[in-house]
UniProtKB/Swiss-Prot annotation:
<protein>
    <recommendedName>
        <fullName>Importin subunit alpha-1</fullName>
    </recommendedName>
</protein>
<dbReference type="InterPro" id="IPR032413">
    <property type="entry name" value="Arm_3"/>
</dbReference>
<comment type="function">
    <text>Binds specifically and directly to substrates containing either a simple or bipartite NLS motif. Promotes docking of import substrates to the nuclear envelope. Seems to act as a cytosolic receptor for both simple and bipartite NLS motifs.</text>
</comment>
<dbReference type="GO" id="GO:0006606">
    <property type="term" value="P:protein import into nucleus"/>
</dbReference>
<dbReference type="GO" id="GO:0005654">
    <property type="term" value="C:nucleoplasm"/>
</dbReference>
<keyword id="KW-0813">Transport</keyword>
<dbReference type="Pfam" id="PF16186">
    <property type="entry name" value="Arm_3"/>
</dbReference>
<dbReference type="GO" id="GO:0005737">
    <property type="term" value="C:cytoplasm"/>
</dbReference>
<feature type="domain" description="IBB">
    <location>
        <begin position="1"/>
        <end position="59"/>
    </location>
</feature>
<dbReference type="GO" id="GO:0006607">
    <property type="term" value="P:NLS-bearing protein import into nucleus"/>
</dbReference>
<dbReference type="GO" id="GO:0005643">
    <property type="term" value="C:nuclear pore"/>
</dbReference>
<feature type="region of interest" description="Disordered">
    <location>
        <begin position="1"/>
        <end position="42"/>
    </location>
</feature>
<dbReference type="InterPro" id="IPR002652">
    <property type="entry name" value="Importin-a_IBB"/>
</dbReference>
<dbReference type="InterPro" id="IPR016024">
    <property type="entry name" value="ARM-type_fold"/>
</dbReference>
<dbReference type="Pfam" id="PF01749">
    <property type="entry name" value="IBB"/>
</dbReference>
<comment type="subunit">
    <text>Forms a complex with an importin beta subunit.</text>
</comment>
<keyword id="KW-0963">Cytoplasm</keyword>
Amino acid sequence: MGDEFRPSHEERSKMYKSNVRDQNEMRRKRREDEVQIRKNRRDEKFERNRQITVQRSLSHEETSELLKSVADGLQSMQETTIHEALTVLHENLNNTVWTIHVLVKVQILHKLSDVYCNRVISQTTRLLISRTLLKISGIDEVKYERYSSDDRCIQSLVFNISTYGSSEDILCDTFQSIACFIIRSITYRNLALDCAIVSELIDASTINMSIILHRSLMWLVFLFCEKLDRCSPHVDEIAPLLEIISNGIQSTDAMVQTDAASSCASLAEWPPIYHYMSDLKLCSKLVANLRNDKGNARPKVKAGINSIIQATGYFTEEMIDAGLLEVLKGFVNVSYMSQEVCFIISNICVEGEQTIDKLISSGVLREVARVMEASEYRSRREAAFVICHCCASANQKHLEYVVELGMLSAFTDLLTCMDVSLVSYILDAIYLLLQFGEMRLLPDNSNPVAIKLEEIGCREKLEFLCESQSVDIHARAYTIIDRFYVDDDAPLNDDPFAGYQRNNIDDTIEKMIREPIMDQPFSF
């Protein structure tokens, strides 16, 4: 049934035509409109997404800028600026805007620790820092309400190691923060030990660490090994760290090796730990590290071995058995190492006659003799101390070996140096060598060592030293000449007063000696 109000097809066609639009044009227009609508919608969606992305990036940028401003404020030397930065940080933590994972990106933990330890700040600011550290770690402040600010800081940092052990960023920042406290005072070291930090460090060392984290850990362990003779903890608290040190010595990273060697050197000054170090063969591992041709940490390892030998003779035999002498023998004549190596050998010499026997049998002393003749003064000086220590044993075999080395000329040339200590040692060595020569007299009863020394000009040097202003050197030189170098050209006179003309004064003196005059009472 038709609609009377609806126009017919023809009429509609006329209407389209009157509007100059036919059916095809209308279809095209609708298609264009639809395309335009879809395009607009697509543009709107893109713009909306772009705005959302921009808003997110701006929000992140604003957060980063705010966090950066807080980090910069903590590095200020003005307490007002520091306090403002702490207030902003604490507020954002309360609002859970920032987490520990975000904060460690700018090393907030280390910066807070640096402010706490190295800035002149009020107790209020210290309290705020301790509360902030607890908040960052996610610890309830009420639980530690009665603790001191120092305890709160250390507790929160140790808590981070156990809680966030899988995050290298957090561990690195935490290790650096604890190191900051320990550098400030050994009291903080003992506080950390009371918080059972050693077990946490042992657990952290078992994970697969990056080089940066391993360096941070080894540096922290080294700080725990320093100054153990002051406010000493129990040895059982420190002994577990030796396993970390052992792994550090065998590391491929030079910085880790360096800190491990420094740790051993520091431990050598604390006798209670010697037994534990010996069980793990730490010094033997140091020697093995020194033997490694690819070790970039060789100078520090060498210095660590030197410090250990200086501090104690407990490990000398262990290191010699591990091949230390063979290693040093190869380094003695290396120009840039000879001084330090000769210094180590001179310290080894004082361990006793058996050690000197090993130095002789290994050929180390013969290499030292070459240093006496070829190297610059500082190396020759240390080599001379080696020879002096060998002579000081007074063992005939050692003295004979020194004479046979053929370096007495270079050795006695150092008598003209300005080092009073060295000259005194050399004079003592010459005296012992001349004593040895008296036991090996030639058929004409002459001292072969005295003859040899005189041939190389030693006697002239001794006569020169007799005029020294140093009483010690003067006495030593005069004693040697007086005993071993009698002047054969001087006329022998049994009576030193032969030809002396007596007079009346001599008679009076003799009479006074025979008959002493008794003092008479004084009277007016």
